[in-house]
Each structure stands twice: as C-alpha cells, then as structure tokens.
Amino acid sequence: MEFSKNMVPSEAGGNVKNRERPAIIIGAGPAGLTAAWELQKAGCPSVVLEKDRVVGGLARTVCFEGYRFDIGGHRFFTKVDAVNRMWHEILGIDLLRRSRLSRIYFKGKYFNYPLKFLNVLFGLGLKHSSLATLSCIRAKARPRLPEVSMEDWVINRFGRVLYETFFKTYTEKVWGIACTEIRADWAEQRIRGVSLSSLIATMLLFRRGDQIKTLTTSFYYPKLGPGQMWENVRSRLAAAGNPVLTGAEVTSITHNGHLITEVAINGGEESERFPVSQVISSMPLRELISKLNPPAPSKVLEAALDLRYRDFLTVALIVNKAHLFADNWIYIHDPSVKVGRIQNFGNWSSDMVPVAGHSCLGLEYFCFENDDLWSMDDCDLLALASREVSVLGLAPMAAIVGGTVVRMPKAYPVYDAVYRSKLRIIRDYLDCFSNLHPIGRNGLHKYNNQDHSMFTAMLAVRNILGEEHDIWAVNSDCEYHEEMDEASDMVDSESRI
C-alpha cells in the first residue's frame, strides 16, 4: 500500500510523527506488526507492546529441539494485493509456493475438503449417500426459517444427514457449545459458497474450472514458518528505531472521555507510562475495556464480560518416521478422539523438520481456559496425543520420540447468540475515542484470517493519516479485490453490527 503525499497525520491525539508521543500499538501479532510497518513507511514512529515473550500471536512459530511448528497452520493466501506485496517484500525467496491437501477423517475413512460429491458417495456408501441426497432435497423444499443458527444454515444447504455426518461433531468439538448456539453468520463466513446441490451440479456439468470460495489449491508459506515473517518485521522495525517490547503487559489505558492520553505497562515498581498520539489495539476487546481508566460505564463493562472466547492448545509430536500422510493437515471429525485437527509440518516446509526421516506433527485441541483439558499436565497431554495419533493409524506410538505443549488463550472469538448485541454496545462506546483504533481478530471480535487482520491494520493507519474507513465493517466474507483503492468493496453494506 502506498501513501500519497497529500495524506497528513491526524491531529486527534497530537502529531503522530512526534517521537515524544509515538503511536502505541498493543499486540505484536499480524495486525499489530502490520500497523507498525505501515506507520514506519509513512515516517511515523511507533512502539509495539506485546505481553508475551515472542511476537507473531497466533501466527508465531515455535522451535522445539530444532523442530518448528505453528500454533495452528497458517496458509499465506490473499486476494488483497497490499497484503501480498508485504509478504513478498519481507520474505522474498523464503516465501515458498505450496500445494494444498487437506482432508476430513471420519470413521476410518478420508473425505476431501471441501467435500466432493463422488468422494462422499463412495466414502459413505450407496445407502448413506442416498439418505443424504434425500435429506438435502427435503431441506431445499422446506428450509428452516428464519436462518438463525449454524445448524439452520448448514441443514438448509446440505440436509440433516450430511450436517450430522460432517459438520455437527467437528464444530461442537471446536467451539465447545451446541451448533444451535452458534450464529448462522459464522457458517456463512467459514463455509461460504458451497452446498450439496452445487457439488452435484459441478460434477454433472463438468464445471472443473469452478472454484469453491473457501478452497485454494495452493498457497504461500514461509520457509521457517509464519513466525519467520513476524520476526523479520520486528527486526526491521527495531533497526529503524521503532521498538517492539515483549513481556510488556498493558495495565492501564488512561483517557479523558474522548482521547486516549497514556498507556501504562507492567504495574508496580516496574511500571512504565507512554504518552500517546494514537493507540492501535489488537488486544481482546474484553481486556481493552477492562484496562480503561477511568472505567467504562457499567453497561459497557458488562457487555465486554459477556464476550466469549474459545481457547486452544497444540501438542507437537516428534516422530522418527517420514511420509506419515500426504496432507498439510487433517480435520478429525471422529467423535471417539478429542483431537480436532492434525498438522504435518514437513508437508508445509521441509525446513521445519531438521532431521531427515523424521516428522513433526501438531495435534490441535480446542478447550476453555482452565477446563480439564487445558489444566492437564504436559506429560498427560503428550500421552493423550500419542495414543490418539496411534488410534487414528497415523503414527505408531513406538515411533514417537519427543514432544511439547503450547497453550494459546483466547484463540477464537465465539459467535454466540448474544455477541452481536454486546459488540454493538462496545463499539458505540469506543467510537467516542477519536485516537483509538481496534484492529485484528480479537481487537474486533471477528473470526478472521491473517490477511484480513493485516488489512484492518492497513486501514487503521490510513485513518490516522487522514482517510476515513469503517474498520468494523470490513467484510471477511466477500471476494477480496486486488487493489487497496477498491477497499470500499470489502465492507458490508450494513456497516453497523
């Protein structure tokens, strides 16, 4: 994204080019570091505050005994040209082109993802497939209206049989709540552009060129994992005098009712205070509201507390066998195991695995912070993951030679029945602060991808430099346009949530 010469810094919180009052960016994930990068390109100083000891957020890469793994696999795929340019600018030849293969594992069989009609037909068998087709016809003839829940949305497009076969178990494993409690807009965002009828039509009409919106047949991936991207950005920011401070937890955000004036980190004797011109925040909205000083109105505080999150942990297993399976990752729909998804990081990049003939698997478990799974000892989680990968037939227990566990709180904002009304209350209040800019997945409480988070950061910087974009309205559901000049096409027609 290029900044035109006629853009000027916003005066809302003072001159953003004043190094005495830099822009403060909360969070060093893709959104926060992208914001710092774009400000640097515009000649504006910033300080990034990250409470963890490493950068990258959910897009970090962890190194264990030389083996690298993601906190969930991160494909680098976008139709936003500015995001694509940034990836290539930072990574250069280390940004690899990879073929995508991901499948569903269900009752001992593999199914293509997204679903393909013939694959489903032969995988389920004639009887089950016939029932699925009749169920879909019935759903089309008598759709569930109004379409409120994720269950409504999926049944209307696939019928109840396929919903219960492929969607219900996995979705409830991921979110920890019933599909009837998940809003339909989550399904619209994550499963868009596909239905059983469209799959059948594609097969019968031989429309081989048609691409389902959620499907990409290839993607980019950094040689050493997504953390390589964000470590590189951090280094370049620091070299230009724009520090990224880790272990810097925000404890207080002071305001005067319409401007943020100061951000404090790490309370007590080590407290440090930053006077600010602008604040860009990717921290969870619940935490942002709780840090405001003076406190937000009780109605806003209560709304923030009602926002829910799903937490996540990865068990990385080192296996002394190669070529365990061809997929980048596998979705585990089988209800007999707790694991939700399994990554094979050597299939993302061979440089993630330092020893020839070995593999590094990432078993992903979805949980709530402090529940039984989250609270298990690491040794028990390693034993659980080893048993489950063996039961699934993906790796023999005897071949597992090591492993580690990484926990990630607040990985996914939950789209439950009340989140939209609570988010409206929070947004209306935050709109009072002219120099506060929420961005990213948790900053906006939107279940979006890495490129979408980066795009919201780019728009926030444009706003600081004098443009006007409604970041809350950025629509991660639609087809992205190639140029940032067409950013207006990426926002919902209804800008309010």
Descriptions of predicted regions:
Residues 144, 277, 281-288, 374-381, ...:
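Conserved mid-domain beta->alpha element of the FAD-binding
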Residues 40-63:
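Glycine-rich FAD pyrophosphate-binding loop
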Residues 42, 248-395, 406, 420, ...:
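Mid-domain catalytic core of redox enzymes
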Residues 82-99, 103-113, 157-164, 236-246, ...:
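Feature captures the FAD/FMN-dependent oxidoreductase FAD-binding
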Residues 3, 13, 409, 416-497:
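C-terminal lid/capping helical subdomain adjacent to the catalytic/cofactor pocket in oxidative enzymes
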Residues 21-48:
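N-terminal Rossmann-like FAD-binding beta1-loop-alpha1 element of flavoenzymes
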Residues 120, 125, 130-253, 275:
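Active-site/ligand-binding neighborhood in enzyme catalytic cores
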Residues 65-142:
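Dinucleotide-binding Rossmann-like beta1-alpha1 core, especially the glycine-rich loop
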